[in-house]
Amino acid sequence: MTRPLSYFHLHLISDATGETLLAAGRAAAAQYANARAIEHIYPLIRTEKQLRKVLEGIDAEPGIVLYTIVDQKLAAIIDDSCAEMGVPSVSVLEPVLNTFQSYLGAPAHRRASAQHVLNADYFRRIDALNFTMEHDDGQLPYDIEEADVILVGISRTSKTPTSIYLANRGIKATNVPIVLGIPLPEVLFTAKRPLIVGLVATAERISQIRQNRPLGNVPSLDTGLYTDRVSISEELAYARNICNRNGWPIIDVSRRSIEETAAAILALLRAHNEKG
């Protein structure tokens, strides 16, 4: 018998943006199919006054409390207050910091938002994002050799979101659509530095996505072909043939999240760069 869906409050308190905490909370919540978290996110909490207001909200809607607060005084207030309210509280980073401290033999500096310093890595990500957004969907740059990754594939194979995810990791990614019967730009076949990866999916999966998100510039007479599984299968065979002829690796994204697809591409990129 299927258990009914239940809901619970999940309070996420951070002295930074809360991205780390949100990812951890959602990863844990995803393990419970019959429970849904009502998320309450409190970023940039760095004073006791701010924290007291947050705690009032938790008292009004009790639930699990996760926090990433490096100030030990504020962390103690959270734990003590939650204990009084009878709700669980967990410092997500504390076990990790303790492990680092034990292994490195040195205490952490405990600086809020230390991971968000405007350093070279930060500006590399911004540069990659600009590159990706300027060269999305076949807008190949004259300086194509600056690209780290070029994704190719038929419509609705997650090329753009995967490119953007990679750019957030500091990877200059661009993408080129494969359209049945239309030759790809010659520059793709002469590029030396970029890793070129083909993205595919099942015809069923692509048809479903295309029905939900039709392509705006498809003429009405072609709309049926755009979502027809037989036609999509022909497109996929055409795309696979191109990739196989050129030795481009292929990733099936049918059952992969964007994160999983990006992880596979990053593994291919490491091997590509090692070969030189």
From Swiss-Prot:
Superkingdom of source: Bacteria
Keywords attached to this entry: Kinase, Nucleotide-binding, Serine/threonine-protein kinase, Transferase
Keyword Nucleotide-binding in annotation: yes
Signal peptide: none
Catalytic reaction(s) noted: N(tele)-phospho-L-histidyl/L-threonyl-[pyruvate, phosphate dikinase] + ADP = N(tele)-phospho-L-histidyl/O-phospho-L-threonyl-[pyruvate, phosphate dikinase] + AMP + H(+); N(tele)-phospho-L-histidyl/O-phospho-L-threonyl-[pyruvate, phosphate dikinase] + phosphate + H(+) = N(tele)-phospho-L-histidyl/L-threonyl-[pyruvate, phosphate dikinase] + diphosphate
Gene Ontology terms for molecular function: ADP binding; ATP binding; phosphotransferase activity, phosphate group as acceptor; protein serine/threonine kinase activity
Kinase among keywords: yes
Residues reported in the UniProt entry to bind ADP: G153, I154, S155, R156, T157, S158, K159, T160
E.C. designation(s): 2.7.11.32, 2.7.4.27
Family: Belongs to the pyruvate, phosphate/water dikinase regulatory protein family. PDRP subfamily.
HAMAP family listed in its UniProt record: PDRP
Function of the molecule: Bifunctional serine/threonine kinase and phosphorylase involved in the regulation of the pyruvate, phosphate dikinase (PPDK) by catalyzing its phosphorylation/dephosphorylation.
Protein name (record): Putative pyruvate, phosphate dikinase regulatory protein
Lineage, highest ranks first: Bacteria, Pseudomonadati, Pseudomonadota, Alphaproteobacteria, Hyphomicrobiales
